[in-house]
Amino acid sequence: YTQFEWVEAGIGSTGTTPGSFRLQHDILSKGKVDLLFVEAAVNDDTNRFSALEQVRGMEGEVRHALESNPEMDIVMLHFIYDPFIPMIARRQMPDVILNHERVANHYLIPSINLCQEIGERMQDGEFTWDDFGGTHPKPFGHKFYAAAIGHLFDEMWKGVSPAGTIEA
């Protein structure tokens, strides 16, 4: 089995602009990074970063990471929070996710749109927002996040570059 050394560098309520400035000190300075997860849809939205700031911030994180290790694998995640739920119900993707996806597409980074998946599952009556645990999920909600990441890894290990949304 692969031995992992985890660097937990998440700071709540920040987003990509502060994240791009913190990346070197809080993550890259700890040693060679082989796998990096990035997620900021909720905080870039709540902090009201402009579309340009969202793209620049996410690209700042991705580009700086790849400059430090061009072989680094990056996975972009898109989480869900209350204001995104009615948008997903109307089949409207939040602008912040579209902006971050511009960066993912440019750098050919796989992404997992958990916002869409969780929103659609709630629309289908599979569970409620309260069951899921809200913006900071309960263990029940985390199972969906973990399953989606596992599914992405399964697809990538098969040598498949997933097109579209990866689901749990």
Residue ranges and their predicted role:
Residues T2, S20-T165:
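Alpha-helical cap/lid subdomain in secreted, periplasmic
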Residues T2-G15:
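A short beta-strand-loop structural module common to alpha/beta enzyme folds
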